[in-house]
From Swiss-Prot:
Keywords: 4Fe-4S, Iron, Iron-sulfur, Lyase, Metal-binding, S-adenosyl-L-methionine, Thiamine biosynthesis, Zinc. The keyword Iron-sulfur applies. GO terms for molecular function: 4 iron, 4 sulfur cluster binding; carbon-carbon lyase activity; zinc ion binding. Transmembrane segments: none annotated. It comes from the Bacteria. This is Phosphomethylpyrimidine synthase.
Length: 432
């Protein structure tokens, strides 16, 4: 193999096995896909050590992907439950899974997740640093932060969130421009604290070239984290967020010079009317790199329903340029999600992604809806269930409320418009 990364292969004119797989699944020309990867507009997160991976592409012209977050915390450290969540995520067709474990030594869970998961696996190495070294945050050295990155890469992690954009300049901008909710990124807040405690530059920014060497070695895709993403609609599109985005655009070019694949992470909480301009800003400032957004959540007042606030924003974001949606569950801001919370979050994100794909004209997107509409016209319940995004729920609702006649439902009964139009157009009367 005469290439280190998917990007290097693409730039050398090589169509890799991973590119062929993605092109087939996405119904796109492999040569065109290779060009987009060479330009940095599409990534295929595919660590060389992730043997169970079924590769997927993220970026321009492809189906909008969704990510599921899970992992152990100090208060909830049941590895078995988190692995069960991973199995559910795979069953519900999540495209990626991020292990956000932030308590104890996490190698066992991470390795088991990578071993079982055909979906791309991501991590945030800075979360793991404190537990891995058993030190106070202030005492962790820059070299030790990089050591955790290498450990995750060796284990087979496909993409890593690296908060390199909150450098001293970005931090100074944040201090000069007060925010309602300060820094809400967990990794961003840890690095800001480390910088303040030590009076030093962000180690991931200062040693970005060394970071790139690790990522190139294992073909880890860097997901450049948005430490200054807005945590409230009031803080959206402010000086800190835009300053960091400019830095991320500069870091993107540096990564591409080393043939390292890059995604950009984005907001966050944001009013509806600011979503489309933000998608344009990211694509402009970050040179067309794939955009990975958390939501955006379009209002702050719906705890318990943030899978809905996120799906609303996610659909608009993806229709106007975002490529990758991080799911949000009803438990957001409240607790670690349960299996049922996860399912609701995944389904909501998949709805948002699919709605955006229809708008973008992604191959195959509209055809799925046309097949469903045909099944509805024919009152073919089994076909409707097969095509449903959540077949189990559709079947359960139908079974729980049985109509008098099989060709109706309990909403309209024999006044069903679809049934009666079928009968009238075939020459029969509406009753019978």
């Amino acid at each position: 193999m005469n290439y280190a990364t998917q990007m290097e292969a693409a730039r050398k004119g090589i169509i890799t096995r991973e590119m062929e797989t993605v092109a087939r699944k996405e119904m796109v020309d492999p040569a065109k896909l290779r060009e987009l990867i060479a330009e940095g507009r599409v990534v295929i997160p595919a660590n060389k050590n992730h043997a169970s991976l079924d590769p997927c592409g993220i970026g321009q012209g492809l189906r909008t992907k969704i990510n599921v977050n899970l992992g152990v915390s100090r208060d909830c450290c049941n590895i078995g439950m988190e692995l069960e969540k991973a199995r559910l995520a795979i069953e519900l067709k999540a495209d990626a899974i991020m292990d956000l474990s932030c308590y104890g030594r996490t190698e066992e869970f991470r390795r088991r997740l990578i071993e079982m998961s055909p979906a791309a696996v991501g991590t945030v190495p800075v979360y793991d640093a404190v537990g891995f070294y058993g030190k106070e945050l202030k005492e962790i050295s820059a070299e030790e932060f990089l050591g955790v990155v290498e450990k995750h890469a060796q284990d087979g992690v496909d993409f890593m969130t690296i908060h390199a954009g909150i450098n001293r300049e970005t931090a100074a901008r944040f201090k000069k421009n007060p925010r309602l909710t300060n820094i809400v990124s967990r990794g961003g807040s840890l690095l800001f604290a480390w910088m303040e405690l030590n009076g030093r530059e962000n180690p991931f920014y200062e040693y970005f070239d060394e970071l790139l060497e690790i990522c190139r070695k294992y073909d880890v895709t860097i997901s450049l984290g948005d430490a200054c993403r807005p945590g409230s609609v009031k803080d959206a599109t402010d000086a800190s967020q835009i300053q960091e985005l400019i830095v991320l655009g500069e870091l993107t070019k540096r990564a591409w010079e080393k043939d390292v694949q890059v995604m950009i992470e984005g907001p966050g909480h944001m009013p509806l009317n600011e979503i489309i301009p933000n998608m344009l800003l990211e694509k402009k400032l970050c040179h067309g790199a794939p955009f990975y957004v958390l939501g955006p959540l379009v209002t702050d007042v719906a705890p318990g329903y943030d899978h809905i606030t996120s799906a609303i924003g996610g659909a608009i974001a993806a229709a106007s340029g975002a490529d990758f949606l991080c799911y949000v569950t009803p438990a957001e801001h409240l607790r670690l999600p349960t299996l049922e919370d996860m399912k609701e979050g995944i389904i909501a994100s998949r709805i948002a992604a699919h709605a955006a794909d229809i708008a973008k004209g992604v191959p195959g997107a509209r055809q799925w809806d046309d097949k469903m509409s045909e099944a509805r016209r024919n009152l073919d319940w089994q076909k409707m269930f097969e095509l449903a995004l959540d077949p189990e729920k559709a079947r359960r609702y139908r079974a729980e409320s049985q109509p008098e006649s099989e060709d109706t439902c309990t909403m309209c009964g024999k006044m069903c418009a679809v049934r009666n139009m079928n009968r009238v157009l075939s020459g029969a009367g509406p009753d019978g």
